[in-house]
Amino acid sequence: MVIKAQSPAGFAEEYIIESIWNNRFPPGTILPAERELSELIGVTRTTLREVLQRLARDGWLTIQHGKPTKVNNFWETSGLNILETLARLDHESVPQLIDNLLSVRTNISTIFIRTALRQHPDKAQEVLATAHEVADHADAFADLDYNIFRGLAFASGNPIYGLILNGMKGLYTRIGRHYFANPEARSLALGFYHKLSSLCEQGAHDQVYETVRRYGHDSGEIWHRMQKNLPGDLAIQGR
């Protein structure tokens, strides 16, 4: 186990998470007692207590007052906030994780983009207009793309879609910085934003579904060609 945390709390958090991932502390089992665990990791009990509370909030653990702390099946109890952690834990599964993330984005965005363009066209156009001034480099496009999808999610009038995009932000923007280094990807994205703006202006809401699905397919093809050179820094860095 190689841990690159920058603080005692970060080290303890990574130690426990990696131990859960590697089945040293399997789901459904009980964590060692606080004193034993703090000595094992090499941190104070106060620090350990803070870490356990944070991991419980993220769904890794269940703290039971007066009872031992239970290890959860994190797939069933955690949220989108652990995406970057999963990418760091299992590099071999990163391509599949990213495919799943992008598939979810496409599936839900067919709903909220159509709703935004139909019910709140002025807000939708305001979001899409931000593409007019984007600088032609990867970082700028990564931020733009995330903010356009997020902006349209909130423009739909259902803030839950926006919260889902919030949960994807970390890994989503890291992927974007790699993906948008490709000029073809930047060109495709600009065409997509322009098409959505035109559909909004025309009131052609029935074409949104196919437009979003087509963009998901075409951008997915570019992404798959680029996966051979996937950088190792997509995962979150140690705390």
Swiss-Prot record:
<dbReference type="InterPro" id="IPR028374">
    <property type="entry name" value="FadR_C"/>
</dbReference>
<dbReference type="InterPro" id="IPR036390">
    <property type="entry name" value="WH_DNA-bd_sf"/>
</dbReference>
<comment type="function">
    <text>Multifunctional regulator of fatty acid metabolism. Represses transcription of at least eight genes required for fatty acid transport and beta-oxidation including fadA, fadB, fadD, fadL and fadE. Activates transcription of at least three genes required for unsaturated fatty acid biosynthesis: fabA, fabB and iclR, the gene encoding the transcriptional regulator of the aceBAK operon encoding the glyoxylate shunt enzymes. Binding of FadR is specifically inhibited by long chain fatty acyl-CoA compounds.</text>
</comment>
<dbReference type="InterPro" id="IPR008920">
    <property type="entry name" value="TF_FadR/GntR_C"/>
</dbReference>
<keyword id="KW-0804">Transcription</keyword>
<dbReference type="GO" id="GO:0006631">
    <property type="term" value="P:fatty acid metabolic process"/>
</dbReference>
<feature type="domain" description="HTH gntR-type">
    <location>
        <begin position="6"/>
        <end position="74"/>
    </location>
</feature>
<keyword id="KW-0443">Lipid metabolism</keyword>
<keyword id="KW-0678">Repressor</keyword>
<dbReference type="Pfam" id="PF00392">
    <property type="entry name" value="GntR"/>
</dbReference>
<keyword id="KW-0805">Transcription regulation</keyword>
<keyword id="KW-0276">Fatty acid metabolism</keyword>
<dbReference type="GO" id="GO:0003700">
    <property type="term" value="F:DNA-binding transcription factor activity"/>
</dbReference>
<dbReference type="GO" id="GO:0005737">
    <property type="term" value="C:cytoplasm"/>
</dbReference>
<feature type="DNA-binding region" description="H-T-H motif">
    <location>
        <begin position="34"/>
        <end position="53"/>
    </location>
</feature>
<dbReference type="Pfam" id="PF07840">
    <property type="entry name" value="FadR_C"/>
</dbReference>
<dbReference type="InterPro" id="IPR014178">
    <property type="entry name" value="FA-response_TF_FadR"/>
</dbReference>
<keyword id="KW-0963">Cytoplasm</keyword>
<dbReference type="GO" id="GO:0003677">
    <property type="term" value="F:DNA binding"/>
</dbReference>
<protein>
    <recommendedName>
        <fullName>Fatty acid metabolism regulator protein</fullName>
    </recommendedName>
</protein>
<comment type="subunit">
    <text>Homodimer.</text>
</comment>
<dbReference type="InterPro" id="IPR036388">
    <property type="entry name" value="WH-like_DNA-bd_sf"/>
</dbReference>
<keyword id="KW-0010">Activator</keyword>
<dbReference type="InterPro" id="IPR000524">
    <property type="entry name" value="Tscrpt_reg_HTH_GntR"/>
</dbReference>
<dbReference type="GO" id="GO:0000062">
    <property type="term" value="F:fatty-acyl-CoA binding"/>
</dbReference>
<keyword id="KW-0238">DNA-binding</keyword>
<dbReference type="GO" id="GO:0019217">
    <property type="term" value="P:regulation of fatty acid metabolic process"/>
</dbReference>
